């Protein structure tokens, strides 16, 4: 029997690279799409048949017919938000019940986790991380401290387990002087979400995914956020609470490392970041504002303005190394169509010394070293084949491939799945 293949798709920057669209483009090549980490703090935006969708917890393969979609054990799930997301998709004619499978080991985001999120941020004052307030961090905290609730718990003495967790959280909130809240209505909707979850296939996803592989099925593992937000390798402490890197696909789905084949790394032709945290190539001038406006750079979940800057090749080399990236996917190339000159950060100056390696701390004393390249000054949004690409843009791709020592396999020139060029 032929063993199926496992490929991984993940972001190489600070998230928002365009993973949702790429998964939707790649899913025809796979039998299974599996989400391996994160929660409803990250939104994957897709445009499908003229309609825009933002997926927060549900894998992006849900639009592709009878593909199996798996929410893995590494994901944290908010039942109320999941219910709202699923019902919106059902209204659009997408039936999730047959094709969506959820790991019983995935952890639940409780209403009090969101309160803890707000309380912890308030207590940090000026040092706050700038979370989305969805309760992600406190949920992963409970997971690591072995006090969390998992989806498998909803079938056995759940009310008792929930009451214990809630009481513990409320004691912490009291110690933080965070007592002005009423979660009655939120809790009611949350419990409705728990009942709604019971309608789906709750599975031991690690067994299911390995059985599917043994049967010869191909699997695409879908990450959320980006490498530079990884809890271990990102710009700590302003990071997320899970492993967004390739290794997270193994621990978040129960897949052995030797099963991993291709690792697709997604990058924008420039760089963005939402919220607080260091960002060496950030632009504070009209150029940054122009990139934001042309790229519609606003958070899919929060609506917050994204900070914009030139592409950072130091951070990208680091991300490619950590993930073992085999192929690059270049997104939002068309956003730079109007620029006379493009800049790329090829090195950092750290305390006066030039380096191509990503340092321990990029908060202070890091100065980007730029190389300028000519812009292509061509509207690429209507281009449908590689041979139509302007020479200056092809030169930009070759420059990236040389700097990053990794081939660019796919180029996106617009938000629709049709605006995608697969290079030979």
Language-model features, listed with the residues they occupy:
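Non-transmembrane, aqueous-exposed alpha-helical and coiled segments at domain scale
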Residues: 1-424
